[in-house]
UniProtKB/Swiss-Prot annotation:
Required for rescue of stalled ribosomes mediated by trans-translation. Binds to transfer-messenger RNA (tmRNA), required for stable association of tmRNA with ribosomes. tmRNA and SmpB together mimic tRNA shape, replacing the anticodon stem-loop with SmpB. tmRNA is encoded by the ssrA gene; the 2 termini fold to resemble tRNA(Ala) and it encodes a 'tag peptide', a short internal open reading frame. During trans-translation Ala-aminoacylated tmRNA acts like a tRNA, entering the A-site of stalled ribosomes, displacing the stalled mRNA. This is SsrA-binding protein. Signal peptide: none annotated. SUPFAM superfamilies: Small protein B (SmpB) (SSF74982). Belongs to the SmpB family. The gene is smpB.
């Protein structure tokens, strides 16, 4: 699995509930841009439209000198049952949304998007998460000094 782009900053302040894999419908120049690893997912999100999923605000950089729409909405490819299940969970849970976590090539060289059902964290949860992360870094540092 070769990662094209990750969405680290876009997931700050969110707690990941579950992850799914989806295909993506791309044009030829977008595939070439993905192979060149010039994709940005920072402010992107996923929305429902007529029972289908769409990726919005994902920036695929221009390939060569083509006049193209870089920030168009791209259709995500999932089974209908998975989409319905995801929509039901989104409606049932409060303050949840769907965000892309990364775009990658799978083992068959197909471009896939990993999407996550995420829930917004409040300020106290963010502080706890930062403390936990700092403690883990400190423990790793201490372990490396003794080994």
């Amino acid at each position: 699995m070769k990662v094209i782009s990750e969405n680290r900053k876009g997931l700050y302040g969110y707690k990941i509930i579950e992850k799914h894999e989806a295909g993506i419908s791309l044009l030829g120049w977008e595939v070439k841009s993905a192979r060149a690893q010039t994709v940005n997912l920072t402010n992107s999100y996923i929305f429902f439209k007529k029972g289908e999923l769409f990726l919005c605000n994902a920036n695929f950089a221009k390939y060569m000198l083509l006049k193209v729409e870089e920030d168009r909405d791209r259709k995500l490819l999932m089974h209908k049952k998975e989409i319905i299940r995801l929509k039901n969970k989104l409606d049932r849970l409060s303050s949840t949304t769907i965000k892309p976590t990364k775009i990658y090539f799978n083992n068959k060289s197909k471009i896939k998007v990993e999407i996550a059902l995420v829930q917004g964290m409040n300020r106290a949860d963010k502080r706890e998460d930062l403390k936990k992360r700092d403690n883990e870094k400190y423990m790793q540092k201490v372990k490396s000094n003794y080994l």
